[in-house]
Design a protein with these regions (language model features):
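A residue-level marker of the well-folded mature domains of exported/periplasmic proteins
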Residues: 26-334
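Cleavable N-terminal signal peptides
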Residues: 13-14, 24
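Bacterial N-terminal signal peptides that target proteins for export
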Residues: 2-12
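Sec/Tat signal peptide C-region and signal peptidase I cleavage site
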Residues: 20-26
Length: 334
């Protein structure tokens, strides 16, 4: 499989039948994962990328919010049959459906985010979430007064362990004595949209001494951010920049530029001349992941903290610090 990197220059719910009505030939399509388009996190980042493309080009796109896993193959076939190109999918659960459908539509280009499908008309985009999580883990440890940090993941799957493992490594890098409290909202897709449980897990972490909690849980993470704000402690957002949700309480957000991936896919994947099948990996060097600093959290991060994070970022890019990727061997050496 071809593996490529996108440069910084490039990185610059309705029913299915209703969505497809009137779809124009070669309009791009985006299918969001379970959890809702407006989850203020992963799916919403994908939506924002589609909207950015629309604003830049004046073009139209079609989209769909999945209601259940059974819709995946049906949605792909219907969009492809209507002439949508490219078809972009957000989420790691698309592997089987896309592997089945892509060969049926050899003239359609597909782009999938967060999983790998080895087909000649598929571009797979992965992110180095572990390196971005390393940086926010370091910032969390530098900010913490208790030395105890929490993590609330969504669905208990390897990808979310990848976030946790990077976070824990970053925390331990700057404070070897840091204590990490790890929890997940569930083992089914419902885990992405359960802010009540996520808030309870954040409270449990606080009860054990945590004063900073990283939420990598999709829509469920909103419960973590709320619980930490209510308690006067700090949270860390994920995927989208969530600093604005609770100014002065969200320490930072581990941003994952799903939005730019979607915009780039809409711009390039519909044309065979610019389509890049194979695997594309976006990391710190490509600004595919990172941490957010803006007017909502700039008073929470000292110049020294930001300087440390930037130094760590440079060392990771240079290869001087190696951040272990949980998904390579299902382990997290700390």
């Amino acid at each position: 499989m071809k593996i490529s990197k996108i440069s910084k220059a490039v990185l610059g719910s309705v029913a299915l039948s209703a969505v497809l009505t009137g779809a124009a030939l070669a309009d791009p399509a985006i299918i969001y994962d379970l959890g809702g388009k407006f989850d203020k996190s992963f799916n919403e980042a994908a939506y924002n990328g589609a909207e950015a493309w629309k604003a830049e080009t004046g073009g139209n796109y079609i989209d769909l919010e999945l209601q259940n896993d059974a819709q995946r193959e049906q949605a792909l076939r219907r969009f492809a049959s209507q002439g949508a190109n490219p078809i972009v999918m957000a989420g790691f659960s698309w592997t089987a459906a896309l592997d089945a459908v892509a060969p049926e539509f050899a003239d359609t280009n597909f782009v999938v985010i967060d999983t790998v499908v080895d087909q000649p008309n598929v571009q797979s985009i992965l992110f180095d979430e572990h390196t971005g999580s390393f940086l926010v883990g370091a910032l969390a440890a530098l900010k913490s007064e208790t030395g105890t940090l929490g993590f609330v993941g969504g669905m208990d799957v390897p990808l979310i362990h990848k976030f946790y493992c990077g976070y824990a490594q970053g925390a331990k890098h700057v404070n070897p004595d840091a204590t990490l409290i790890e929890s997940y909202t569930g083992t089914t897709p419902a885990a992405w949209n359960d802010p009540v449980t996520a808030g309870e897990l954040a409270q449990a972490a606080m009860d054990s001494g945590a004063d900073v909690v990283f939420a990598a849980a999709g829509g469920s993470g909103l419960g973590v951010l709320q619980a930490m704000a209510d308690a006067g402690r700090y949270s860390i957002g994920v995927d989208s920049n969530q600093n604005y949700l609770h100014p002065g309480s969200v320490l930072t957000s581990m941003v994952k530029r799903v939005d730019v991936a979607v915009t780039t896919a809409f711009n390039e994947a519909g044309d065979d001349a610019t389509f890049m099948p194979g695997l594309t990996i976006l990391g710190l060097a490509e600004d595919g992941v990172g941490y957010a600093v803006d007017e909502n959290n700039q008073d929470l991060l000292t110049e020294e903290m930001v300087a440390t994070a930037e130094d760590l970022k440079a060392q990771i890019i240079a290869g001087d610090i190696e951040v272990h990727d949980y998904t390579t061997d299902s382990s997290c050496p700390l």
